[in-house]
């Protein structure tokens, strides 16, 4: 079954699709549901409970940061990496719910870690609750981050079904089938993918989406190569990308043209993006 380019490549907050991208989307969807149910204006406090795997790695894998982003109603594409969103919430203990309403929010109290509790449906579980001024629960929802940034609410996960296959000119389910198509049609892999994507959405939209992902990836590489110090998350892990970058730049200045040097540059770009 064919998977769209945009299902495999998407813009999200790192470092993990299941521990950051998924929780951010879940928290954002929860805020959207408050709006849909006309409860948003009654909210005086929100609370997040992390279960199992998310609780065990919450700070180190950026889950808490991601949930704060989601509660703020932020989309991954709109986040400015230079802005201290979470540190401002930690300092002021104020969260701008859905980018609209400032409410009290203390990360140490309003994000709860249930490290010993694994929900039966999936190890990456989270519960969101909103309260009114009298302490009554307005909306209580449980979500799961099931991998690749995909989320499911508790009432949805038990009835998840595979989507209908996309109708594309060149369907394939393995690399061997893809290469066979390329040889038969005289097309490159990129040609096949582009033709398929253009069957799912307008060509201009495809190219714009690819360009946006490329720009974000390039910006992540550039920032990651220049950043120094320790990684966020409280684990005190030193960044490596900048050191590798300086070493490779020195080799370039010394005219050290090792044919395997390109592999080192590719590894550097991987480190740079991972550390961003």
Q: Which positions does each model-derived feature cover?
A:
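Short, hydrophobic/aliphatic alpha-helical segments
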Residues: 1-12, 47-50, 263-276
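Conserved phosphate/anionic-ligand binding catalytic regions in large, soluble enzymes, centered on
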Residues: 9-27, 60, 276
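Generic secondary-structure signature for well-ordered alpha-helical cores
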Residues: 32-39, 72-77, 133-136, 215-227, ...
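Flexible, glycine/charged-enriched surface loops at secondary-structure junctions
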Residues: 38-45, 78-81, 224-237
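N-terminal amphipathic, basic-rich helices that act as targeting or association modules
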Residues: 174-220, 224
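Accessory "access/gating" subregions that flank catalytic or transport cores
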Residues: 204-276
């Amino acid at each position: 079954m064919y998977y769209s380019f945009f299902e495999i490549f998407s813009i999200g907050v790192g470092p993990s699709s299941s521990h950051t991208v998924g929780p951010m989307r879940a928290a954002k969807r929860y805020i959207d549901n408050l709006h849909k149910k006309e409860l948003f204006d009654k909210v005086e406090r929100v609370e997040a409970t992390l279960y199992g795997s998310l609780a065990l790695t919450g700070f180190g894998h950026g889950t808490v940061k991601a949930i704060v982003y989601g509660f703020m109603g932020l989309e991954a594409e709109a986040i400015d990496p230079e802005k201290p969103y979470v540190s401002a919430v930690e300092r002021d203990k104020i969260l701008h719910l859905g980018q609209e309403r400032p409410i009290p929010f203390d990360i140490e109290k309003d994000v709860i870690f249930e490290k010993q509790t694994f929900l039966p449906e999936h190890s990456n579980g989270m519960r969101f609750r909103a309260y009114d001024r009298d302490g009554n629960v307005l909306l209580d929802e449980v979500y799961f981050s099931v991998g690749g940034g995909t989320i499911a609410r508790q009432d949805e996960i038990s009835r998840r079904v595979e989507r209908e296959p996309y109708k594309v000119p060149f369907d394939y389910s393995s690399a061997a089938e893809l290469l066979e198509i390329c040889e038969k049609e005289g097309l490159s892999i990129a040609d096949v993918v582009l033709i398929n994507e253009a069957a799912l959405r307008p060509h201009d939209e495809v190219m714009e989406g690819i360009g946006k992902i490329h720009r974000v990836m390039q910006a992540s590489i550039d920032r990651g190569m220049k950043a120094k110090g320790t990684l966020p998350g409280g684990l005190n892990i030193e960044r490596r990308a900048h050191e590798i970058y300086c070493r490779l730049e020195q080799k370039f200045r010394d005219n050290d043209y090792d044919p395997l040097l390109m592999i080192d540059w590719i590894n550097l770009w991987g480190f740079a993006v991972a550390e961003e």
